[in-house]
Amino acid sequence: MDQKYNPQAIESKWQKIWHQQKTFATPENLGDKETFYLLVMFPYPSGRIHMGHVRNYAIGDVIARYQRMQGKAVLHPMGWDAFGMPAENAAAQRKVHPRDWTYENIATMREELKSMGLSYDWDREFATCDEDYAHAEQVLFLRLYEKGLVYRKHAFVNWDPVDHTVLANEQVIDGCGWRSGAPVEQRELNQWFFRITHYADELLDNLQHMDGWPETVRTMQTNWIGKSHGVEFAFALEGYPGTLPVYTTRPDTLMGVTFCSVAAEHPIAAAVAENNPAAAAFIKTCQGVGTSEEALEKLEKKGFDTGIKAIHPITGESLPVYIANFVLMSYGTGAVMAVPAHDQRDFEFAKKHGIEIKVVIQPEGQTLHAEQLSEAYTGPGRLVNSGLFTGMDNEQAKQRVAEYFEAQGIGKGTINYRLRDWGISRQRYWGNPIPMVHCAACGVVPVPVAQLPIQLPNEVDFSEPGNPLERHPSWKTCDCPQCGQPARRETDTMDTFMESSWYFLRYCSPHMGGVPLDKAAVDRWMPVNQYVGGIEHAVLHLLYARFFHKALRDIGEVSCDEPFARLLTQGMVRKDTHRCAQHGWRYPKEVQERDGALYCIECGGAVTVGRNEKMSKSKHNVVDPNDLIAGYGADTARLFMLFAAPADRDLEWNDSGVDGAWRFLGRVWRLVLAAIERCGERQACTTTPADEQLKAFRSQLHNTIVKVTEDLNRQSFNTAIAAVMEMSNGAIATFKGEDRLTGEASALLWETAQVTVKLLHPYAPHMTEELWQRMGEQSLLSDTPWPLADAAALVKERVLIVIQVNGKLRSKLEVPVDMAQEAIEKLALADEHVKVQTEGKTIRKVVVVPGRLVNIVAN
């Protein structure tokens, strides 16, 4: 049998065995087994896996294999988030159908994932573009429509001019489309929405109890939901019929209002623009402005004076009303009472337009003067120049102003949310059709469930931008399900975040055809015990999934309130960037090192090392996982990814770290083969050895079991590996030599081999399965229980005591754990290093802390 560690041969062998024996199939008959649902966010089938995938899925696999060895019934599935714009782009560029492109990519990536030795139940695999999944999703859409959680309305939406589709607010990053990067425009369209705002309070309140989630993610969702308490009231208007309703969280600043501003989409703005070309032109420029907080902060504040005046509800002053590019129609009423002295955006606008600034809050110990302000004062203080509210603390004044407004019938206290209903209409082909029909006689009519699924047409034209379904008359034309007259099919498809909002439930019963879920199976497995994925999904996928889960609960499909009990957000994989003056970014293989300097292989020019950044094709700082696995094996790749950094921190790529992981696995390989060669009885040690060295090492071995178990339970994967490394070094030192062992030495080495392969199995499953088999075991290591520590071996007989002189470390002393304090004191004073430090001095005091230290005070 080959004595050399050959990962390529070993890994293909065990992947085949696991596949043939269906080792990781989810058990159907659970009995009284505890269940554990481990899920890593499924990937978009872009064509190839990258190092971020390798890290992500290695983390998930360690958890799944560990829980399996703990005796739990584990559900560990994989699938594909398969709808989306890239497939349409590929269709246009490469003249290939999105479906063909998608399934070809899935086939490639499936094999790449299998080469990592991941313990997936591949029998539960599905792609969200599969007919059954799309069918089931259409059924859920109709059920939520019946529940009143889906509706259609005209609304200003975020329009991506490159992808020619609508984006939800969460999909606009710094004013640009999350995928295309193009500046987003505002357009008014008829759109389908989910009533996520109906669940705003529950989504917010539940976050307080989700202790298994990172605090950063909970904070991000809290801020995104954006619950605020304020006052809603209306300004009377001069020069325009009706009133101007506003919402403010700062009623304490009411007396400092000097103008009002409205969003470009506000009805007042539209009315003014009808007869004013300059206003219409200004509104058009506003529609290209980003909608994120960051974009609005950086934006140059611009406005257009409408000529309309708002009447202050208390002072009666006339205030100018502006159309402003920094006011969002989607927040509050789309109109703002502007207080330039105490709001930075209003301050910048007032300065630019020469509008009066009134200070109405003075901080303690200071006097602010409007003409001297360089920025708005937004801190606490007492009200000034505020009529009957003058002298009040500003927090107290918020409540008093609200009470005054209600008493006077001017306005009322109200609660507002930053969160807006989720617009799911997308103007593209490669998505799930919305199962609705538009009839001239009947209006909007849902497609009966019996007529589902609505399938996408195969013959489509991608030569023009926009939605091909809109240009497909034979598909678009249908009969009204209600009256039978000619009607038009809905041509918008669903946002792809729809698919990822319930896929985790489908894994519980993936073979149900058009029936969405088997509730008994869902109740058996949900919630997901451990979810793993990137923090970039905090207010996109994770928020939508929480909402959708609650909506499905309310129509009886699920029982639990939250879908994910614990969340681990892994860090990014980063690598140095390299740049050549002539050829730009260089891949690592395009750079050569000579005499300590780097040169471009193509032109010989000097290459500079840039920032350590997230691996990306655009910066060429990527390492191909296939090359890594071909060169070192999947076990080395997995081990490095899990050892190089804590799971929730960024990992900085280091080639020497990969070599180190490879060498460590080689040492373990040789250690276990040595045990096979040298151990006579091949029986594990079950009692405490008489030999002191063996006794000490067995204590280290079993303390390592405790350490690794604790580390895996708290997901400190890198420190668990470090503990096994330290223990294996101790084993090599303890059992050095090549002679055949008998008795307690043989038993302990054999126990060491057994424990080592078990502890390493979640990290390096192929190598450890091979070693387990070579040790003569008949069962799969994947089916073997996790090792348990022997309590007797954990009892420490000796302890290391630190000796300090005047608080400074001077020596160490190993003593029996039950040694009397007087004896420890005597040994400490007799220590040669202590004698040197106390020579010629008087010992004033000796403090003995049992089991820890001795401090000698001398002068």
Curated annotation (Swiss-Prot):
Q: What EC number(s) does the entry state? A: 6.1.1.4
**What protein name applies here?**
Leucine--tRNA ligase
Q: Name one Pfam family in it.
A: tRNA-synt_1
Q: Give the matching Gene3D superfamilies.
A: HUPs, Isoleucyl-tRNA Synthetase, Domain 1
InterPro entries hit by this protein: aa-tRNA-synth_I_CS, aa-tRNA-synth_Ia, Leu-tRNA-ligase, Leu_tRNA-synth_edit, M/V/L/I-tRNA-synth_anticd-bd, Methionyl/Leucyl_tRNA_Synth, Rossmann-like_a/b/a_fold, tRNAsynth_Ia_anticodon-bd
The broad enzyme category this protein falls into is: ligase
Please give a single GO biological process term from the UniProt record. Answer: leucyl-tRNA aminoacylation
Q: What Gene Ontology terms describe where this protein resides (cellular component)?
A: cytosol
S-S bridge residues = none
Family recorded in the similarity comment = Belongs to the class-I aminoacyl-tRNA synthetase family.
Q: Where is this motif: 'HIGH' region?
A: 43-53
Q: Does the keyword Protein biosynthesis apply?
A: yes
- What domain of life? Bacteria
One annotated GO molecular function is:
aminoacyl-tRNA deacylase activity
Sequence positions that bind ATP? K617
Q: Does the keyword Cytoplasm apply?
A: yes
Q: Which HAMAP family match?
A: Leu_tRNA_synth_B
Ranges spanned by the short sequence motif 'KMSKS' region, renumbered to the chain: 614-618
- Give the UniProt keywords, A-Z: Aminoacyl-tRNA synthetase, ATP-binding, Cytoplasm, Ligase, Nucleotide-binding, Protein biosynthesis
Catalytic activity entry: tRNA(Leu) + L-leucine + ATP = L-leucyl-tRNA(Leu) + AMP + diphosphate
Compartments it resides in: Cytoplasm
